Each structure stands twice: as structure tokens, then as C-alpha cells.
From Swiss-Prot:
It comes from Porphyromonas gingivalis (strain ATCC 33277 / DSM 20709 / CIP 103683 / JCM 12257 / NCTC 11834 / 2561). This is Minor fimbrium tip subunit MfA4. GO terms for cellular component: cell outer membrane; pilus. Component of the fimbrium tip. Minor fimbriae are composed of a structural subunit, most often Mfa1, and the accessory subunits Mfa3, Mfa4 and Mfa5. Mfa4 is required for Mfa3 and Mfa5 insertion into the fimbrium. Fimbrium assembly occurs by linear, head-to-tail oligomerization of fimbrial subunits. This is mediated via insertion of a C-terminal beta-strand from one subunit into a groove in the N-terminal domain of the following subunit. Residues 19-53 form a propeptide. Keywords: Cell outer membrane, Fimbrium, Lipoprotein, Membrane, Palmitate, Signal, Virulence. Pfam families: MfA4_C, P_gingi_FimA. It is found in: Fimbrium; Cell outer membrane.
């Protein structure tokens, strides 16, 4: 009888212990939340280049500041954090780990629509300060009067977003930051009829010129469903009026070469055999963006003027220019 009583007592103790351990009324640990980020790779593509990924240079991945917006489930009432150093009001930023630790707890956060914006200037910050709803982000933009390199340059505006339940997991991992700009690279191999011995002034090829046509001025934090055009060209002159076009420079001939600019190759006889141009630009939803190049022909004396004068090469860019895409072209003229 004593044995049965002992077994019953032990069984009751085990049941009581199990019930107390699984009691839903027991408080769950409420910890501060964390958000980790990464810079997304470029999508590299073009007429002669297969689809691939490219992480870009250190300058193209640079982050100088962050702006966090944590909207509630309805896309309203955002908690906002501007981060310009390792410590800020509401948390700390660990750049080596690409992680933000906030003072906000899991219960305070709950489920959130999280947006991370990087490299904001004063105008963009002021606009973000006024954002009240998720949809407002599509109106926040940066305007560049001359929207090509070198005016569009590192550090680049980036953004990324995810929806996350912080009650289930206090860490929101790997929010991808996508550059809000695109990149165009044009490598031109010249045939013999364009291989002249150039006049070089301060490193630039006087006879070779180019212009950007119908580039968009606006860089949006979050792209509108249909982006409206605000276009400009780098020169007003339309072929064959090329007086105000840009002469071909040699910035890409330096070492180390910058990520964008112009460059060229000379052979042993001093003739131009190749041209290269790399520029950043804004996304576009409508076609019409073009790179135009004026190429001088070799004057062999067989044709009267102006037949042996410069010729026009026109590179139409894609009908839609997508952010964070690197369009690379290898052409022979």
C-alpha cells in the first residue's frame, strides 16, 4: 500500500511540474529587436552579355547613413529611426555586422512592415520625416539636374523592405538594399575607317564626342507604379550639330580606374582603336533613353567633304531601365 501511495505521489508531482512548465500564462522573454541588412548585387545584362550578378565595387556598396521606418500591419503609424553613426536615439548600428539593434521590444514591435533606406541627403530625410503611410514612400525622391556621371555618384540611394513578425523572431534577417539607380557600360571596338590619330587636348580626344539623350532627373526611394518622366539631355545640339557635345575624356585610363567615366585605347601608331563609356542613370518606365556618339572617319581623300566627316552611332537603351541593373554592351563599329 505504501508503494502505491509513493507512486501516486511521484506521478502527481510530475504532472504538476509539466503543467506549470507549459502554462500559457507564464510570461515569455521580451527582448529587443534586431534588423540585419545586405546590399543587393547588380543584375548585369546586355545585348552581348549573359544574365549574371555582380556585387559592384566598394564605392557602389557604400552606406553612409540609414533611415528605418517600421509601419504597423495597416501600413501606417511608422516608428522612425535616422542612423548617422554607431549610436542613435533608439538603438545602435553595427556596420561590420550590417545590423541594427533597436531598443524597441518584441511586444512593442509585433508584426511590422519594415523599410530601410540608405544614403539619404537632407531633402530625402526631410521628406521621410513627413511620411505617414507606406504609400507616401512612392512620393519621396531626389532630383539631379544633370542625371548622369559624375553627378549621379556614390553613395547611392538604396532601399529595401520586408514584412516580419517580431513576436515569432526578434531578428529580421537580410533586408536587401537595392540601388535606386542603373548603370550603363558601352565598349566600342573601332574598325579601320574610324581609327584615326587623334588630337589630344588635356587627355581628351577632340574629334570624338558623345551626348546622353532623354535621361530622367528623378531618383525615387520606392518606385511609383508608373514612374512619370522628367527628362533632359546632356547637350541641346542634335546631330549633326555637335558643338556642345562632350569630348571623349580619359578618366577610365587612370589607375585605379573609377567606376564610371570615359576612356580609350591607342595602338602603337597612336591610332584610336577602342572607346569606353560608363555612366549611372535613373530608372525609366518609357523608352527613349539613348547614348549618341560622334565618330570621325579616316580621311583617305577619296570622297569630297562632308562625306568623310564625323558619323553618328546611336545606342538605344532598353524600353524599361530598371534600378540596380548594369547594362553592358560590346559593339564593333
Amino acid at each position: 500500500m505504501k508503494k502505491y501511495l509513493l507512486y501516486a505521489s511521484l506521478l502527481t508531482s510530475v504532472l504538476l511540474f509539466s503543467c506549470s512548465k507549459n502554462n500559457p500564462s507564464e510570461p515569455v522573454e521580451d527582448r529587443s529587436i534586431e534588423i540585419s541588412i545586405r546590399v543587393d548585387d547588380f543584375t548585369k545584362t546586355g545585348e552581348t552579355v549573359r544574365y549574371e550578378r555582380n556585387q559592384g565595387s566598394a564605392a557602389e556598396r557604400l552606406i553612409t547613413n540609414l533611415y528605418l521606418l517600421l509601419f504597423d500591419q495597416s501600413g501606417a503609424n511608422p516608428a522612425k529611426y535616422y542612423i548617422a553613426g554607431n549610436t542613435f536615439s533608439g538603438g545602435i548600428w553595427l556596420p561590420d555586422d550590417m545590423k541594427v539593434k533597436l531598443d524597441m521590444t518584441q511586444s512593442e514591435a509585433g508584426e511590422r512592415k519594415v523599410y530601410v533606406v540608405a544614403n539619404v541627403d537632407n531633402a530625402v530625410k526631410t521628406a521621410l520625416d513627413a511620411v505617414a503611410n507606406e504609400s507616401d514612400l512612392q512620393t519621396v525622391k531626389r532630383t539631379t539636374a544633370m542625371p548622369w556621371s559624375t553627378d549621379i555618384a556614390s553613395p547611392f540611394l538604396m532601399s529595401g523592405n520586408k514584412t516580419h513578425d517580431f513576436l515569432a523572431n526578434r531578428l529580421l534577417d537580410n533586408v536587401p538594399l537595392v540601388r535606386a539607380i542603373a548603370k550603363v557600360e558601352l565598349n566600342i571596338s573601332l574598325s579601320e575607317k574610324f581609327q584615326i590619330v587623334p588630337i589630344i587636348v588635356n587627355g581628351s580626344l577632340s574629334e570624338f564626342k558623345f551626348r546622353y539623350v532623354n535621361f530622367d532627373k528623378e531618383t525615387y526611394v520606392v518606385k511609383p507604379t508608373t514612374k512619370p518622366d522628367n527628362l533632359i539631355s546632356s547637350a541641346n545640339g542634335v546631330w549633326p550639330q555637335i558643338t556642345d557635345w562632350t569630348v571623349w575624356g580619359a578618366s577610365l585610363n587612370t589607375s585605379p580606374a573609377p567606376d564610371a567615366g570615359t576612356g580609350y585605347t591607342l595602338d602603337a601608331n597612336g591610332k584610336v582603336t577602342a572607346l569606353r563609356i560608363v555612366t549611372y542613370l535613373n530608372e525609366r518606365d518609357s523608352k527613349g533613353a539613348t547614348v549618341e556618339v560622334a565618330l570621325p572617319r579616316v580621311d583617305d581623300g577619296t570622297l569630297p567633304p562632308p562625306e568623310f566627316g564625323p558619323e553618328l552611332y546611336r545606342l538605344p537603351l532598353p524600353d524599361k531601365i530598371l534600378r540596380n541593373h548594369w547594362y553592358k554592351y560590346e559593339v564593333e563599329i
